[in-house]
Regions:
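Sec-dependent N-terminal signal peptides
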Residues: 5-13
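Long, low-complexity, polar and repeat-rich extracellular regions
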Residues: 1-2
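Sec/Tat signal peptide C-region and signal peptidase I cleavage site
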Residues: 14-20
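Outer membrane beta-barrel
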Residues: 22-35, 42-164
Length: 164
C-alpha cells in the first residue's frame, strides 16, 4: 500500500509538467482580380507570382523550449491547380519542423537558405529586386530540401544564420 501511494505521489508531481500550450495557424495569400479585355471579363492571374496556403504551429515544451512546424503550399487561383515552379511537389515552399529555445532555433526540412532568409527582410514589395540589389546581385539558391538550419538567439540585436 505504501509503495503504491509513493508511486502515485511521484506520478502526480510530473502531471503538471506534461501540460503545454500549443497553437496552430492557417494563413495564406490570395492575389486575383478581374480583367476586362476585348469586351469580355476574365479572371486575372496573380501579379505577385503565387497564391499560398500555410499551416503553422508551435507547441510550448516548457523550460523555455518549443517545437514548431510550417507547411506552405502554392496554388493557382483560377482553378486550384498546384502552382509550383519546376513541377515541384505539394508544399514546395517552406516545409519544416524545428526546436527553439534559449540556444536559438534548429529547423529540419525544406526552407529558405540563410542569404535568402536575411534578404527577405529587405524585400518590402516581394519583387526580389531590392534583395538582389542589396547583395550586389548575388542570388543563391532560394530554398533547399533536406536542410539543417540554425538561427542564433539575438546577440546584441544581431543574429547568426547557418544552413547545410
Amino acid at each position: 500500500m505504501k509503495k503504491s501511494l509513493l508511486a502515485l505521489a511521484v506520478l502526480s508531481a510530473f502531471a503538471g509538467a506534461a501540460s503545454a500550450q500549443s497553437s496552430v495557424t492557417l494563413s495564406g495569400r490570395v492575389d486575383a482580380g478581374l480583367i476586362r479585355q476585348n469586351g469580355a471579363w476574365n479572371m486575372g492571374g496573380s501579379q505577385s507570382g503565387y497564391n499560398a496556403l500555410t499551416f503553422s504551429g508551435r507547441e510550448d515544451l516548457g523550460g523555455g523550449m518549443n517545437a514548431f512546424f510550417t507547411l506552405n503550399h502554392r496554388f493557382g487561383i483560377n482553378d486550384g491547380s498546384i502552382n509550383n515552379p519546376g513541377g515541384a511537389s505539394n508544399f514546395c515552399r517552406n516545409v519544416f519542423v524545428g526546436l527553439g529555445g534559449g540556444f536559438g532555433d534548429v529547423r529540419l526540412g525544406r526552407m529558405l537558405m540563410p542569404l535568402q532568409e536575411w534578404n527577405g527582410a529587405f524585400d518590402a514589395f516581394d519583387t526580389g529586386y531590392v534583395a538582389s540589389t542589396h547583395t550586389g546581385g548575388i542570388m543563391a539558391t532560394v530554398r533547399s530540401t533536406n536542410t539543417i538550419y540554425y538561427r542564433s538567439p539575438s546577440l546584441g540585436g544581431f543574429f547568426a544564420h547557418a544552413g547545410i
